[in-house]
Amino acid sequence: MDLKRFIRDIPDFPQKGIVFRDITPLLRNQEAFKEAIDRMCELVSDRDFDLVVAPEARGFILGATMAYKLGKGFVPVRKPGKLPYKTVYEEYQLEYGTERLHIHEDAVEKGQRVLIVDDVLATGGTAEALIRLVKKLGGEVVSLAFLVELSYLEPRKRLKSYDIKTLIVY
């Protein structure tokens, strides 16, 4: 199945000059969503990890589903003010501003091996912040998995020392 045909391009969103890759048509289609999750799980089937860590919002959809299918725990990473317990955070740059990601301070135990999952790998900024959070808690990032990669933004240059798996590449 060509999953790329389920990704909708939205020009000039969230600001002029950016083409947003909308995954909601893929999520809406039962067969495409199942195929995407199955294939993403296959991409990491040879990796040994304990937890899936994923950021809100679309990362939750993919990460939690993959964690369930793979029999792993799931750790949500959220924007400020959304987690009820004590958190640690990292700031990072987006194409259109600065953002913070928070994780519960006890979400990853020292030595736990982590798979990071998100919907789109663009500049690599979010992924870098997620890696820093996992390391701050004593975890080890063994791989990162993304539904979509925007290769023209060259995110792998920033993440060159990490194992990166992507399903759809632009």
UniProtKB/Swiss-Prot annotation:
One of its GO terms (molecular function) is adenine phosphoribosyltransferase activity. It comes from the Bacteria. It catalyses: AMP + diphosphate = 5-phospho-alpha-D-ribose 1-diphosphate + adenine. Its main location: cytoplasm. Catalyzes a salvage reaction resulting in the formation of AMP, that is energically less costly than de novo synthesis. Its EC number is 2.4.2.7. Pfam families: Pribosyltran. Keywords: Cytoplasm, Glycosyltransferase, Purine salvage, Transferase. It is found in: Cytoplasm. The lineage of its organism: Bacteria, Thermotogati, Thermotogota, Thermotogae, Thermotogales. Homodimer. It comes from Thermotoga petrophila (strain ATCC BAA-488 / DSM 13995 / JCM 10881 / RKU-1). Gene3D superfamilies: 3.40.50.2020. Pathway: Purine metabolism; AMP biosynthesis via salvage pathway; AMP from adenine: step 1/1. One of its GO terms (biological process) is AMP salvage. This is Adenine phosphoribosyltransferase. It is an enzyme of class 2 (transferase). GO terms for cellular component: cytoplasm.
